[in-house]
Amino acid sequence: MWTKAHRARHDARLKEVVSLHAVGEVARWLERVDPPRSARATPYAAVVRGLAWHLRVGGAWRALPFGLIHWRTAYGWLRRWLGSGLLEALLRHVAGLRRRAAGRKPGPRLAVIDTQSVECIPVRGPRGYDAAKKVLGRKRVALVDADGTWLAVAIVPANVQDRDCLDALTPGKQAWPSLREAVLDGAFVAERCEAWCNLHGMRRRVVERDPAQKGFVVLERRWVVERSFGWLVHWGGLLRDRAGRLDVSAARVALAAVLSGGEALINPMPIQDAAS
């Protein structure tokens, strides 16, 4: 829950969502696992800084300001890291570091799954209309742990029903074999959702809102994934989906989660719930 302690930590954070220290840590990790092939290659720190600016401020790739790397270079490196699986590995690495910093085991046992529909600008690529949310765009499918740390993310057209989105999370779930329980909302009550959880060795727990309750209600466990979605509003480039490809769209969300996780490691918030 959001408490006075959380508010104090939030007010004490740096003005920028991404600090140079977080950018440097991400760049150093990438250099260790994917060393530059040439001494004249663009420094990874410059690449990550340009990508962070693009995600933080928003706008077209061509809008990267003078003084940062060329937009084609930034986009090319993002596609390269996406194709090689480095972004997914980096997301898992940061998630493990955050769990250790919170006093937890590296392998989570509880997963919280939810979706978020966002508008899509007029670009090429698949999209759809979410009749429930009245949104024309795409749907983000999030897999987070008990603290709201991002474990995996997938992107599907917004017209895909929530109960049909779990298949998109299969690669992300397979990367975390320690998961044993999944918390979902009432949109995942279909038998195919239970079958998906059973297939991956997880027990399904559906947390639904009481129809008699009015207004905003904090739901058990589910509030952490809503908070994770809420933190994305700090990234101007993620307020609307701008990517022409679904995998690039997922990579942009994953990179924002990595940079936010790196910043949280520098200035963490207190965690009250110690359940994994």
Regions flagged by a language model, labelled:
Residues 1-276:
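Short alpha-helical elements
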